């Protein structure tokens, strides 16, 4: 059986799309090996049929400290990849892929790059000259060098299996309530609105906000969101609101006190193990704008207010969110310019005008791609045909 190596690490945003691709490749009969770093160890599930290897590669701002670590990782990668004897290596960007990708080039193994963001990252840009193909998630991607444009193939983002198993959601302004559409119904009625309501949304008087900050940057949300909700409830005191929010244990006590005084129903977690459960009940999401988050929300058509993480590499989260906002598929509020008052006004505007949610859901679904299938096809066409 032919072997394929996936290389991704750093955050769940890189890790989970790579796993989704690996699962599809296994279904097609390939043996999939996955090289990642120690930070992603917590995401590895023993039930996965992928063979994992962990590299100890830390990120240093000082290049003199980083180079010795990189050299050790490079030598380990050469030894590992040589013994695996892979036909191709797929890199998902980020500094943890540097050593394995250099090793692949040294061993003359073909490489394919997947860029999840709307802005080609530094690592992927560097390896673009060596890649057979560059798979992208956004048609109007930025920062692609001229020499690499002929290698570009639009495959779309890659979404986890448990998210793909959710039905798409579309918003009915007349009912003020999300309605669940199967893929078949969605295809046949994209320009019409179904009247049937899903039982999970039978209580349409309650508006559910789902708030999460990902593995980075949830602290701001623990301070900004409660202040915004206080303002919102003063402006709309009769609003029936439910909040599902990611927050550290240290912040939960203070936030619970605020929400309790406002008579708001709430749920908290430090980390959502199966985020699909929260997506299923949300009317509106407030989140960061990491690539995998955006792809998941796009796949199910769930409207979102994005607050990009300003410290994200190459400011890619801003470009991701801005692209959706420009296409009326979401809302982008920059952290440096945001205030509790502005966020409260934005939430109130959307609650008061459900047509905006409905339109955003439609526009999200229009951008939906089956990235795990398209990238698998690209790999087979590029390397095995």
From Swiss-Prot:
Its EC number is 2.4.1.227. One of its GO terms (molecular function) is UDP-N-acetyl-D-glucosamine:N-acetylmuramoyl-L-alanyl-D-glutamyl-meso-2,6-diaminopimelyl-D-alanyl-D-alanine-diphosphoundecaprenol 4-beta-N-acetylglucosaminlytransferase activity. InterPro entries: GlcNAc_MurG, Glyco_trans_28_C, GlycoTrans_28_N. Pfam families: Glyco_tran_28_C, Glyco_transf_28. One of its GO terms (cellular component) is plasma membrane. It is a peripheral membrane protein. Pathway: Cell wall biogenesis; peptidoglycan biosynthesis. UDP-N-acetyl-alpha-D-glucosamine binds at residues 11-13, 117, 160, 215, 317. Its main location: membrane. The gene is murG. It catalyses: di-trans,octa-cis-undecaprenyl diphospho-N-acetyl-alpha-D-muramoyl-L-alanyl-D-glutamyl-meso-2,6-diaminopimeloyl-D-alanyl-D-alanine + UDP-N-acetyl-alpha-D-glucosamine = di-trans,octa-cis-undecaprenyl diphospho-[N-acetyl-alpha-D-glucosaminyl-(1->4)]-N-acetyl-alpha-D-muramoyl-L-alanyl-D-glutamyl-meso-2,6-diaminopimeloyl-D-alanyl-D-alanine + UDP + H(+). The keyword Cell wall biogenesis/degradation applies. Belongs to the glycosyltransferase 28 family. MurG subfamily. It is an enzyme of class 2 (transferase). It is found in: Cell inner membrane. Cell wall formation. Catalyzes the transfer of a GlcNAc subunit on undecaprenyl-pyrophosphoryl-MurNAc-pentapeptide (lipid intermediate I) to form undecaprenyl-pyrophosphoryl-MurNAc-(pentapeptide)GlcNAc (lipid intermediate II). This is UDP-N-acetylglucosamine--N-acetylmuramyl-(pentapeptide) pyrophosphoryl-undecaprenol N-acetylglucosamine transferase. Keywords: Cell cycle, Cell division, Cell inner membrane, Cell membrane, Cell shape, Cell wall biogenesis/degradation, Glycosyltransferase, Membrane, Peptidoglycan synthesis, Transferase. The keyword Transport does not apply. GO terms for biological process: carbohydrate metabolic process; cell division; cell wall organization; lipid glycosylation; peptidoglycan biosynthetic process; regulation of cell shape.
